[in-house]
């Protein structure tokens, strides 16, 4: 039950961010493009027997929630609620995907933090990726679940 609530909260945060981006930044000096991935469609609990179909259409496991495309570079953005708990291995997979396929990747827990990242990218001074820090934290912890609140407190 808490899993479903957290997922709904993360979806609400994503929706709020995308709508705010369109209203506040898109076409108003911001030259980048914010797009979404829907990796959750690959989970049978979400899409039932259609997960194989979504995979065949190009959906990839562990992709970040959003991507920001700017000046030919793609930045991965994975949204996490500050008070959420996640499977340690899944966070590691998400960090690996962002480190492998994206120019830079970011775990983000608020709209304000994302705006700071996007503003820095727009200025040509992108903030260092935090994916490897988060991955290293997860690798140092032997628990199966990690608290994102604890990650924020200890790393940032």
Located regions from the model:
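Catalytic phosphate/metal-binding cores of nucleic-acid and nucleotide-processing enzymes, i.e., regions
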Residues: 1-156
């Amino acid at each position: 039950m808490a899993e479903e609530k957290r997922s709904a909260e993360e979806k609400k945060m994503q929706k709020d961010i995308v709508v705010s981006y369109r209203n506040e930044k898109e076409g108003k000096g911001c030259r980048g493009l914010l797009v979404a991935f829907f990796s959750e469609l690959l989970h049978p609990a979400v899409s039932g027997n259609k997960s194989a179909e979504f995979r065949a259409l190009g959906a990839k496991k562990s992709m970040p929630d959003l991507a920001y495309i700017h000046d030919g570079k793609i930045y991965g953005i994975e949204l996490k609620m500050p008070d959420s708990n996640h499977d340690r291995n899944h966070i590691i997979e998400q960090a690996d995907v962002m480190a492998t396929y994206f120019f830079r990747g970011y775990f983000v827990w608020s709209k304000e933090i994302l705006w700071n990242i996007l503003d820095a990218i727009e200025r040509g001074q992108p903030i260092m990726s935090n994916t490897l820090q988060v991955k290293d934290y997860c690798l140092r912890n032997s628990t199966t679940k990690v608290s994102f609140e604890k990650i924020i407190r200890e790393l940032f």
